[in-house]
């Protein structure tokens, strides 16, 4: 006859039960601590949000000629910065080495620049593609960022939902510098992501900053406004915090 050589076989049953209860109690205690930290983190996030949300960074006044138009566009919960492809300030085709990509439709005159979670961009072309795993990683992780560039035209925009800005040469150059620095570069070339499920009108680049709930797509747009000396918020994880600054 074979006997079990395990530890519990030599311990009375009531002792085994007590040890199991102790293990369960320790496990529940650890789970409770995790949940407490989780809810404390969420509470802290919204406390900081409500503290900073009302404050506005005012537009810096200037006597310079305001010759460049910049448009902020809402895209669902997301925001983009719309700029002309060609201007006296920059030729984006040459600057990002995408002249061939832009030949897909020469009637389109502008580019939409947006920042976001790289995995979310590439895995979620449509909201129907969103999975719980992708959503969880986006909300609770610190993930690689990406810059989405979309070929488009202002004539297709709903003008009732946009913010139109006028920038000087100096302010425009600061915004351009910000956008270019938001892209990761290797050997003087932007790191373009060629394997994506979008159309020929869409381009993606690796971003120089990681994405998290502390630095979202709307935080990126808001930083662009700050850099170019426009009215902005202190922290804007949600698009409403940007657009509320421009309500009449």
Regions found by a protein language model. Give the residues of each.
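Short hydrophobic transmembrane-like helices used for membrane targeting/insertion
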Residues: 1, 11-20
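Cysteine-centered motifs
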Residues: 4-6
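Second-shell loop/turn segments in exported
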Residues: 158-168, 206-212
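Internal catalytic-core helix/loop-beta-alpha segment
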Residues: 162-182
């Amino acid at each position: 006859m074979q006997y079990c050589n395990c530890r519990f076989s030599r311990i009375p049953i009531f002792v085994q039960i007590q040890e199991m209860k102790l293990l369960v109690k320790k496990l529940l205690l650890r789970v409770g601590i995790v949940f407490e930290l989780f809810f404390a983190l969420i509470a802290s996030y919204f406390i900081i949000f409500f503290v900073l949300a009302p404050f506005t960074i005012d537009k810096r006044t200037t006597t310079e000629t305001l010759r460049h138009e910049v448009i902020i566009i809402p895209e669902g919960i997301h925001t983009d910065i719309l700029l002309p492809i060609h201007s006296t300030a920059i030729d984006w085709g040459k600057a990002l080495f995408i002249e061939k990509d832009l030949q897909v439709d020469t009637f389109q005159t502008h580019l939409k620049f947006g920042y976001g979670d790289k995995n979310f961009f590439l895995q979620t072309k449509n909201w129907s593609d969103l999975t719980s795993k992708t959503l969880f990683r986006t909300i609770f992780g610190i993930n690689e960022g990406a810059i989405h560039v979309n070929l488009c035209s202002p004539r297709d925009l709903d003008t009732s939902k946009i913010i139109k800005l006028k920038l000087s040469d100096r302010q425009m150059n600061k915004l351009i510098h910000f956008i270019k620095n938001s892209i990761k570069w290797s050997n003087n070339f932007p790191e373009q992501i060629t394997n994506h499920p979008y159309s020929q009108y869409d381009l993606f680049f690796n971003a120089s900053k990681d994405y998290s709930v502390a630095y979202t797509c709307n935080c990126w747009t808001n930083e662009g406004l700050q850099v170019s000396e426009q009215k902005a918020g202190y922290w804007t994880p949600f698009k409403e915090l940007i657009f509320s600054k421009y309500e009449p």
